[in-house]
C-alpha cells in the first residue's frame, strides 16, 4: 500500500515556516522558497502515486476528472484559517508537478511594506494608468493589492478587478470591490475591461497586461476617465514604456506613445533584496511620476532620456533603482554585494557607493 502524502498538512507547515512558494516533483522531496532561497525539506521523496493523489485532492471539481491528462493549469486553493494558494499544475519529463504560491488572507498596509510614501498619493489620482513592474517573485502582487486596498479603505469608489486567477480577496470597505476571473466571469482580460466600462467603475485593476488587446483596452479605460492599475514583467520605467509601445505595430506606435503620454501617471518598478542581518527581504523601488517633461519625451520617442530625469531629479519623489538600493546599503539593511546583484547598472551603483562612503 502506497504511503499517503498529505498536501494539506504540508501547505500548513509551509505557511507556518514563512515560505512564499512550494515545489512538488515526482522523485524528489518537497522544496520551499524562503526569503527568496529554495530549501529542500526533510520530507521523504514523493512518488508519482502520492503526487497524483495530492493533485486530485486539491483540484477544482470542474477539472478533477481530466487534470492528470492536461499539461498546464492554474487554479486557486484555500485552506480555511490558513491561507489561499495559487497552484500551477505542470508536467516535467512526462510526470506531474506542482508549483504553489502562498497568498495570505491579510492584505498588508502600504505603510508596513517599506515602500516609498509617494505610493499612497499616486493612487489618489482620479484617472490614468499606474503600472507596478518587476520580475517574477518581486512582490508585485502584494504591492498592487495594497494599493487597491488603500483605495478600498479610504475612498468611496467602485473598484473592478480582472484577474487570472483571483489572488487576494478584497472585502468591500469604503469602496465596493467587484472581482472577476478570466475564463470564469469574463472571457479575456480585454473583454473584462471592455465590459467593466458599463459597470460604473471608478478604478479598474488588471492582474497583468499580456498583449496589445489588453493594453488597448486599458488605454481606452484611462482615456475615458478611469484609474487603471496593472502589472508588467519589466525592470524599470524605460523598459516598461518600450514594452508597452512595442506591443503594437510600428504604424500605430506614434499614436500609442501619445496615448501613453496623456494617460500614464506613474511606474513603480520593484525588486526584493535579502537582508542577511535581519533575515528578511526588503523592497528596492524605482518610482517614476510622469511630469510635463516626461510627457514630452514620451511623445517624441525619447524614452532613453527619461532615466536621466529620474537620476538627476531631487523633486517629485522620483527615485532610481540604484538610488533605492544605495539607501538600503546606507541604512545597513543590505550589503553592497547584495545591492550589486540586483542593480540594472552596476557601474553607476559603484559610483554611488564611492560617493556614499567617501572619506569613511
Task: Give the residues covered by each predicted segment.
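Short, flexible helix-loop junctions that flank or precede catalytic/ligand sites
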Residues: 1-360
Amino acid at each position: 500500500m502506497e504511503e499517503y502524502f498529505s498536501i494539506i498538512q504540508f501547505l500548513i507547515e509551509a505557511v507556518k515556516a514563512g515560505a512564499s512558494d512550494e515545489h512538488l516533483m515526482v522523485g524528489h522531496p518537497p522544496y520551499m522558497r524562503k526569503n527568496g532561497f529554495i530549501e529542500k525539506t526533510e520530507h521523504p521523496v514523493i512518488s508519482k502515486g502520492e503526487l497524483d493523489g495530492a493533485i486530485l485532492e486539491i483540484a477544482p471539481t470542474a477539472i478533477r476528472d481530466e487534470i492528470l491528462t492536461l499539461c498546464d493549469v492554474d487554479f486557486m486553493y484555500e485552506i480555511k484559517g490558513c491561507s489561499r494558494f495559487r497552484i500551477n499544475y505542470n508536467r516535467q519529463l512526462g510526470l506531474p508537478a506542482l508549483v504553489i504560491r502562498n497568498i495570505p488572507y491579510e492584505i498588508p498596509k502600504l505603510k508596513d511594506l517599506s515602500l516609498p510614501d509617494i505610493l499612497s498619493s499616486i493612487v489618489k489620482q482620479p484617472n490614468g494608468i499606474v503600472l507596478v513592474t518587476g520580475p517574477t517573485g518581486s512582490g508585485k502582487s502584494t504591492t498592487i493589492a495594497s494599493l487597491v486596498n488603500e483605495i478600498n479603505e479610504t475612498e468611496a469608489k467602485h473598484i473592478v478587478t480582472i484577474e487570472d486567477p483571483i489572488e487576494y480577496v478584497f472585502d468591500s470597505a469604503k469602496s465596493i470591490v467587484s472581482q472577476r476571473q478570466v475564463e470564469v466571469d469574463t472571457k479575456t482580460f480585454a473583454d473584462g475591461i471592455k465590459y467593466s466600462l458599463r459597470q460604473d467603475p471608478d478604478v479598474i485593476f488588471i492582474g497583468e497586461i499580456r498583449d496589445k488587446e489588453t493594453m488597448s483596452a486599458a488605454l481606452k479605460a484611462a482615456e475615458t476617465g478611469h484609474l487603471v492599475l496593472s502589472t508588467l514583467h519589466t525592470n524599470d520605467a524605460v523598459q516598461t514604456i518600450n514594452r508597452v509601445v512595442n506591443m503594437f505595430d510600428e504604424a500605430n506606435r506614434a499614436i500609442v506613445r501619445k496615448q501613453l503620454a496623456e494617460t500614464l501617471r506613474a511606474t513603480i518598478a520593484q525588486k526584493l533584496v535579502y537582508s542577511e542581518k535581519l533575515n528578511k527581504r526588503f523592497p528596492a523601488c524605482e518610482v517614476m511620476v510622469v511630469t510635463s517633461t516626461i510627457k514630452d519625451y514620451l511623445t517624441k520617442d525619447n524614452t532613453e532620456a527619461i532615466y536621466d530625469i529620474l537620476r538627476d531629479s531631487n523633486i517629485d519623489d522620483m527615485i532610481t533603482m540604484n538610488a533605492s538600493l544605495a539607501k538600503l546599503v546606507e541604512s545597513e539593511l543590505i550589503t553592497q554585494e547584495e545591492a550589486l546583484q540586483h542593480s540594472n547598472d552596476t557601474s553607476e551603483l559603484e559610483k554611488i557607493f564611492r560617493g556614499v562612503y567617501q572619506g569613511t
